[in-house]
């Protein structure tokens, strides 16, 4: 094992995660229908600051992410600063790393803390699949640009006359990889076939995710980390995730047809994460700054790792690549972990990563490592359910996982937890967390 890389400031301070909060997550076109991501971000950051009782001017940086960009608010981070009463001089910028976006936001704030340029910051992300940047065709876009340069009405009419009826149809956001044309579900199908993952195994994991998430809500474990929201017309509160199917049975999952490979596939809407709206954020500080403010951190960021792999085959194996690197940098092994939380983009992707984490052959022949990362103990894995149940507002999922894992670690008396996710473009992320 290589030497561990401690995440500390120049003064030796650990990176403290003081608190975290999220909105409830809502299925597309339900509770947050018509609410843009920037407003979801304002909701969660405003409430996070109010609950923490930290002076607004103590936050020196806000790094926030959004995957489905809105052209009218390209820097969501700055809009959140301006819309929540934070100090107008607060540094703010936006990031995007697909499904690992808030992992990146956390890493960026941590790096600012380690560099000594700030002592406290906020990281998070928000996405809306209900408020989308519906575009126009390339032909219409080109004509509209040319029309702006036309000098006469005749010239403008000539330009418009070149358009066909189909050129006027709206264009929804792309769901396929730009470089390959493959949808993530196509890759999940490929991975299911490559690694022998059956439909029954996928449905069982999805059912497990919903059952555990429903139990977590029933036992009150999520109440502290999920805010109650009010949206226009402000009549009814929205306080719990609305995708969780706590009363479903395995027989219900078996009824659904494959969503991607219609004839021979096994990936369905039920064993995949749904399109979701929501936001999540965490406050990070140097350990000494937290003490100055009289705060007791949820936990600490021990290490992180980002990886990138080929997009044509096994594109969603990011966790199998990033997990051993994050563990190595933390100076830990799989056996040292109390909790292991993996983003469930698809049950097939999740099961493939779990399989390869325990594979000696994959470790030697693909990762170039002497031994497997290690089998993941089911008693430590996604103990409160995962993204298949909660949903997946792309940029918010990482912050949800971090907050949820730290709270659960504290309930168990402390220890180490690892959170990891795959992301579009063959990207992967993993972070090791510590709670006392």
Swiss-Prot record:
GO molecular function: acetyl-CoA C-acyltransferase activity
GO cellular component terms given for this protein: cytosol
Keywords (A to Z) from UniProt: Acyltransferase, Cytoplasm, Fatty acid metabolism, Lipid degradation, Lipid metabolism, Transferase
InterPro entries: Ac-CoA_C-AcTrfase_FadI, Thiolase, Thiolase-like, Thiolase_acyl_enz_int_AS, Thiolase_AS, Thiolase_C, Thiolase_CS, Thiolase_N
Catalytic residues of the enzyme: 99 (acyl-thioester intermediate), 392 (proton acceptor), 422 (proton acceptor)
Pathway: Lipid metabolism; fatty acid beta-oxidation
GO terms classed as biological process: fatty acid beta-oxidation
Domain of life: Bacteria
Pfam families xrefs: Thiolase_C (PF02803), Thiolase_N (PF00108)
Enzyme Commission number: 2.3.1.16
Protein's UniProt keywords contain Transferase: yes
Catalytic activity: an acyl-CoA + acetyl-CoA = a 3-oxoacyl-CoA + CoA
Compartment(s): Cytoplasm
CDD domains xrefs: thiolase
Family stated for the protein in its record: Belongs to the thiolase-like superfamily. Thiolase family.
Record function comment: Catalyzes the final step of fatty acid oxidation in which acetyl-CoA is released and the CoA ester of a fatty acid two carbons shorter is formed.
PANTHER family the UniProt entry points to: ACETYL-COA ACETYLTRANSFERASE, CYTOSOLIC (PTHR18919:SF107), ACETYL-COA C-ACYLTRANSFERASE (PTHR18919)
Subunit note: Heterotetramer of two alpha chains (FadJ) and two beta chains (FadI).
Name this polypeptide is given: 3-ketoacyl-CoA thiolase
Species the sequence originates in: Salmonella schwarzengrund (strain CVM19633)
